[in-house]
């Protein structure tokens, strides 16, 4: 990226028009991005009358405030040389947000001598380094808020027998042997923990199994008892039915035996009355026959 013409390096005029039309560019990789590159990028928003590049930041002076605001809106957060730019109006500094335990006094915003002063208040001028520090503080705050990426889970390897070597005449363990022993110790402790967990789980499962078996045995006993009770009740009902049937049969037999005994006197009486009537008829006929004679 190259520009056609280079502008002046003056970006520290104190008149209100210049202050309101000046753009601050923070988080700039000045080791790669040069002045001509900045002019080429920001010249599309309007005429540039001044451009100064410093370590980590730069200033661009436009002819009008409208061009400066358009550049801020269009180029803010743009990534150049691997870094997102922090662009804002130089005459509208953002409030300083210090980290806890690292407070910056208000007097630090002003100094008597400045490399690039742009606003004078009572003999003091704003410190442009304040913009740079503010940007980096905000950048670090952002990185602090972003959670780190999750680490990959490294599978445990089999513990190997750590063979330590010693120098002749000196009882000093080698670094490799020590690291291997540490790794083997950690892996063995991990395997012990796993075996303990497995043992506890196995015990719990066996306890649960015994409980289930006992419950099943109880259920089987209850079912057998219910079946036995049902069979006993069934037998009792059958026996009672048989007794009732036997009683009914015996009663019927008794009734059938009593009926002829009761009817015998009636038959004899009928025969007697019939004989008397016949005798009476014969006597009356004989008397009538005698009278006729």
From Swiss-Prot:
Upper taxonomic lineage: Eukaryota, Metazoa, Chordata, Craniata, Vertebrata
Record keywords: Coiled coil, RNA-binding
MF term (GO), any: RNA binding
Biased composition (Acidic residues): 259-284
PROSITE patterns for this protein: RRM (PS50102)
Coiled coil: 192-254
Biased composition (Low complexity): 176-192
Family matches, as InterPro entries: hnRNP_C (IPR017347), Nucleotide-bd_a/b_plait_sf (IPR012677), RBD_domain_sf (IPR035979), RRM_dom (IPR000504), RRM_HNRPC/RALY_subfam (IPR051186)
Gene3D superfamilies from the UniProt entry: 3.30.70.330
Keyword RNA-binding carried by entry: yes
Pfam families in UniProt: RRM_1
Descriptive protein name: RNA-binding Raly-like protein
Gene Ontology annotations for the cellular component aspect, listed alphabetically: nucleus
Domain RRM: 21-92
Family named by the database record: Belongs to the RRM HNRPC family. RALY subfamily.
Gene assigned in the entry: RALYL
Annotated region (Disordered), positions in chain: 159-195, 245-293
């Amino acid at each position: 990226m190259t520009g056609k013409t280079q502008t002046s390096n003056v970006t520290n005029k104190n008149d209100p028009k210049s202050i309101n039309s000046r753009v601050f560019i923070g988080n700039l990789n000045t080791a790669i991005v040069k002045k001509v590159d900045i002019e080429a990028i920001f010249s599309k928003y309007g005429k540039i009358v001044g451009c100064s590049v410093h370590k980590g930041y730069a200033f661009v002076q436009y002819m009008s405030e409208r061009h400066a605001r358009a550049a801020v809106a269009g180029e803010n957060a743009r990534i150049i040389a691997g870094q997102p730019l922090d662009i804002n109006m130089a005459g509208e500094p953002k409030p300083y947000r210090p980290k806890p335990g690292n407070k910056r006094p208000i007097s630090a915003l002003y100094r008597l001598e400045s490399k690039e002063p742009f606003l004078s208040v009572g003999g003091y001028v704003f410190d442009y380094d304040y913009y740079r520090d503010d940007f980096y503080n905000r950048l670090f705050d952002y990185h602090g808020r972003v959670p780190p990426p999750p680490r990959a889970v490294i599978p445990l390897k089999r513990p190997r027998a750590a063979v330590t070597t010693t120098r002749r005449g000196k009882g000093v363990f080698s670094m490799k042997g020590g690291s291997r022993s540490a790794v083997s110790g950690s892996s063995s402790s991990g395997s012990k923990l796993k075996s303990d967990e497995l043992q506890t789980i196995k015990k719990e499962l066996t306890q649960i199994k015994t409980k289930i078996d006992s419950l099943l045995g109880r259920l089987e006993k209850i079912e057998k008892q219910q079946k036995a009770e049902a069979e006993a009740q069934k037998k009792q009902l059958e026996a009672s039915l048989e007794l009732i049937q036997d009683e009914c049969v015996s009663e019927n037999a008794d009734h059938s035996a009593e009926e002829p005994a009761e009817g015998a006197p009636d038959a004899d009486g009928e025969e007697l009355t019939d004989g008397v009537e016949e005798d009476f008829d014969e006597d009356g006929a004989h008397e009538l026959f005698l009278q006729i004679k």
